[in-house]
């Protein structure tokens, strides 16, 4: 009876795994089992941090807006600013407001003066 050699599917899967894990350090880029485990961990971390990145950027925008607003007046806080924006029905999100705060502070000053009571 002739010998039947194994197929290429497992080798192709491991090659793909090696390409993914080639930048990992130590045994994590050399041994198949640890490569598999590290790949799972990397994908879990990537999934988790995609959500975390959204929260981090929102926090950064809020901090930037708050810093610029505190320069205008001592008693004018961020939450009051956002509340007045919604009351006046100005559709500016936090990302745009943070960019305005960085690049064009005078424009943000005029916006805050317009929406003050």
Curated annotation (Swiss-Prot):
Keywords: Chloroplast, Plastid, Ribonucleoprotein, Ribosomal protein, RNA-binding, rRNA-binding. GO terms for biological process: ribosomal large subunit assembly; translation. One of its GO terms (molecular function) is rRNA binding. The lineage of its organism: Eukaryota, Viridiplantae, Streptophyta, Embryophyta, Tracheophyta. The gene is rpl20. PANTHER family: 39S RIBOSOMAL PROTEIN L20. Binds directly to 23S ribosomal RNA and is necessary for the in vitro assembly process of the 50S ribosomal subunit. It is not involved in the protein synthesizing functions of that subunit. It comes from Lepidium virginicum (Virginia pepperweed). Belongs to the bacterial ribosomal protein bL20 family. InterPro entries: Ribosomal_bL20, RIBOSOMAL_L20_CS, Ribosomal_protein_bL20_C. One of its GO terms (cellular component) is ribosome. This is Large ribosomal subunit protein bL20c. Its main location: plastid. Pfam families: Ribosomal_L20. It is found in: Plastid, Chloroplast.
């Amino acid at each position: 009876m002739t010998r039947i050699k194994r197929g290429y599917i497992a080798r192709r899967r491991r090659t793909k795994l090696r390409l993914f894990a080639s930048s990992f350090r130590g045994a994590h880029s050399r041994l198949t089992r640890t490569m598999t485990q590290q790949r799972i961990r990397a994908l879990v971390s990537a999934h988790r941090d995609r959500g975390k990145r959204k929260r981090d950027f929102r926090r950064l925008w809020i901090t930037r807006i708050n810093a610029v607003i505190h320069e205008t007046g001592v008693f004018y806080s961020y939450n009051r600013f956002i509340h007045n924006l919604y009351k006046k029905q100005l559709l500016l999100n936090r990302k745009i407001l943070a960019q305005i705060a960085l690049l064009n502070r005078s424009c943000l000053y005029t916006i805050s003066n317009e929406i003050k009571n």
